[in-house]
Amino acid sequence: SFLNPSRPVAVRARNNPCNRIYNVVMLALAPVMPEQVMAAGDDTTNAIGMGYQSEDAYHVYMEVVGGGWGACASADGADVVDAPIANCSNIPVEALEVEYPFMQVEEYGMRRGSAGAGQYRGGMGVRRVYRILDDNASFNCYSDRHRIAPWGLFGGQPGAPSRFLVERGGEVLTVPSKANFPLKKGDRLVIETAGGGGFGHPRERNPAAVLRDLADGYVTAEEAREVYGVDVAAHRG
């Protein structure tokens, strides 16, 4: 079958279809077990890598970057966490730059605007930006959630889909979710992973939670008013 192929079929990235099976189960159980399910999240193995040919060696970098988890009936989704079956740790930026001098990490943090709104909001995805410091480098990836956004449940809004970009001069190039993409000195490689879907209608969110999100930079005052129906000035006044 598609999910259990027989030899000698070539296979790769098995974690991604495993995550989609999990999503299907959650969606199927939602109508009968609403208290036990989660909205969709990034739910994928965002395997990103770069290769670089120096004068005396070939350097290979690979890392799995997390994203936002979906919300549930009692809690917001977790921020910037790997998929349940990825089991990968976060590599410190300083270690990356020491080990791979052909690149520099210019930004690394939560991706603003990626979380799906809801009574309980989804988790935030990741935004990471690499500056490429030399030619002879390439970007390689297999990922998912670039076309179909993580869905929300029971009125919750979807999270933002993932996207990989290369900023080259005044041009912005979109990199597919599975790709081998040549890089040039001066390129900015932008990795933005998906946020989680929300659970429940946004207008049912506790205003105190909306104000907390505003203070933490998860939402703007305009989003608090337009999406959640919370007038920040009135609550502060």
Give residue spans per PLM region.
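Glycine/proline-enriched, intrinsically flexible loops and inter-domain linkers
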Residues: 1-237
